[in-house]
Design a protein with these regions (language model features):
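Residues embedded in well-ordered regular secondary structure
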Residues: 4-99, 137-140, 183-190, 203
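Extracytoplasmic/secreted cell-surface and envelope-processing proteins
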Residues: 357-359
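Single conserved hydrophobic/aromatic residue that forms the stacking wall/gate
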Residues: 1-6, 10, 406-413
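Surface-exposed loop/turn segments flanking beta-strands in extracellular/periplasmic regions
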Residues: 17-54, 143-182, 233-246, 289-320, ...
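Catalytic-site beta-strand/loop segments enriched in glycine and acidic/polar residues
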Residues: 346-355
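Transmembrane beta-barrel strand/turn architecture of Gram-negative outer membrane proteins
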Residues: 4-7, 82-95, 99-160, 187-226, ...
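Outer-membrane beta-barrel transmembrane domain signature of Gram-negative proteins
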Residues: 45-77, 81, 232, 241-344, ...
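Extracytoplasmic loops and strand-loop junctions of Gram-negative outer membrane beta-barrel proteins
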Residues: 55-60, 92-95, 178-187, 240-248, ...
């Protein structure tokens, strides 16, 4: 394993200082509302020195950090004449360059094969990973935390005299939510994910006919995501406070699987002719799963994540939704024939016959043939002078049909 650090790479910063004089002239205390008063004059009134009141805020420095990176792996590899195995455990912990942002991952990988005799082979490979992210989630545009460091003017302090986060204390002062405020709001939000995929196979080689190989493989992928986000009550300068907080909890899972069976026959005739024929079937199903989301408001202890459950919110305003994932199924038959003469003259012919739930009901099945011819010119005698610098040169021409599956099953008709 190893540990390192990732510092921010944004070395060129916009210098937003030196504007406090214009700010002083633009704002005076009208006495109508304490939260609308100029922070500069408020600080003077509260006993701060003129230098302290003029200091301003470097929003960029207030939200960045040097992120530590840890990456550790343990592997075990072994085997014998009839079996092999490998197992790997991994742990990753990466802090972001924005405070309170991070990425964690726990992973497991296994790979095993078993050969009880010269005809039969079976095996599996599995990858599992549990991940968690927190803090800044990569928002776009002005909503991004980095963007807020240069859309809020530097003469705006982090807090007003009442201890609340400042925002747009003036029409041209910047965003209503500062970068520091957003970092604080993201502190306890998280998203957790699970990714798992596995493939198992069995293979027979030369069971009855020399050159025949039978193979069956089943693979599956399971993905899950859970997230928890609290939108706190907000008290900001020059902006009406929000009356309620909101907890949003989201979860979904999705399963895809694929089953492929092939029979492959290879034959060499008189050392010059090589033939390979593949016949197979394939079944695919995607989108087995479900999505759910629930929201509630009015949490008494919004800063304590131990109380963040939907049951602890107000029952007077409940939001929820759920849906099944879109399912897509496909079944196909396919064949392929490859021929080569002395490795120089090549021909390939393929045919697929597929049925899909994305096809219209009147055209459930489709046929998709293709053919290609190739010539490996580098093996010709007239190419011998070029072999010192050009060892493989091949021309290939082909024609075929393919299918574009629509992005949504609802578009099939």
């Amino acid at each position: 394993g190893y540990s390192s650090a990732a510092s921010d790479v944004y070395k060129r910063q916009i210098d937003m200082y030196g504007s406090v004089e214009a700010w002083e002239k633009s704002y005076v205390d009208d006495g109508s509302s304490s939260w609308a008063r100029s922070a500069y004059y408020q600080m003077l009134a509260d006993g701060y020195s003129d230098a302290e009141a003029r200091k301003g805020t470097n929003w960029y420095d207030e939200i960045v950090q040097t992120g530590k990176i840890q990456d550790h792996q343990i592997s075990l590899v072994g085997g014998g004449e009839k079996a092999t195995y490998s197992v790997s455990l991994g742990y990753t912990n990466r802090e972001g360059t924005i405070q309170n942002s991070y990425f964690k991952r726990y992973s497991l990988r296994t790979n095993t094969t078993y050969n009880p005799n010269k005809y039969f082979t079976m095996g599996q490979n599995t990858n599992l990973a549990a991940m968690e992210t927190g803090g800044e989630s990569g928002r776009q545009g002005d909503a991004n935390t980095f963007a807020k460091t240069y859309t809020m003017n530097s003469w705006v302090p982090i807090y007003n005299v009442g201890g609340d986060y400042t925002g747009s204390v003036a029409p041209n002062a910047g965003r209503d939510i500062s970068a520091v405020h957003q970092v604080a709001m993201n502190e306890n939000d998280w998203t957790r994910m699970f990714h798992g995929q596995t493939a198992v196979f069995a293979e027979l080689s030369n069971p009855w006919i020399e050159g025949l190989k039978l193979r069956s493989q089943f693979s599956a992928r399971l993905n899950g995501m859970w997230s928890l986000e609290m939108t706190e009550r907000q008290n900001m300068a020059n902006k009406e406070a929000s009356a309620n907080n909101t907890l949003t909890e989201t979860g979904n899972w999705r399963l895809n699987w694929q089953w492929t069976n092939t029979a492959t026959y290879t034959k060499k005739i008189h050392e010059d002719h090589n033939i390979t024929v593949v016949l197979g079937t394939e079944a695919i199903k995607q989108g087995v799963g479900r999505y759910m989301q629930g929201t509630r408001i009015d949490y008494i202890f919004e800063s304590d994540p131990n109380t963040w459950t939907l049951d602890n919110g107000s029952s007077s305003n409940i939001g929820n939704s759920s849906r099944y994932q879109r399912k897509v199924t496909m079944f196909g038959l396919f064949g392929r024939a490859d021929y080569s003469y002395k490795g120089k003259y090549l021909a390939t012919f393929t045919i697929r016959r597929d049925a899909s739930s994305k096809f219209g009901s009147k055209n459930r099945w489709g046929n998709f043939p293709s053919a290609s011819l190739g010539w490996r010119m580098s093996d010709e005698k007239f190419m011998e002078p070029t072999r010192k610098w050009l060892d493989d040169f091949k021309l290939r021409a082909g024609y075929g049909t393919t299918c574009l599956l629509y992005t949504s099953p609802s578009q099939r008709d």
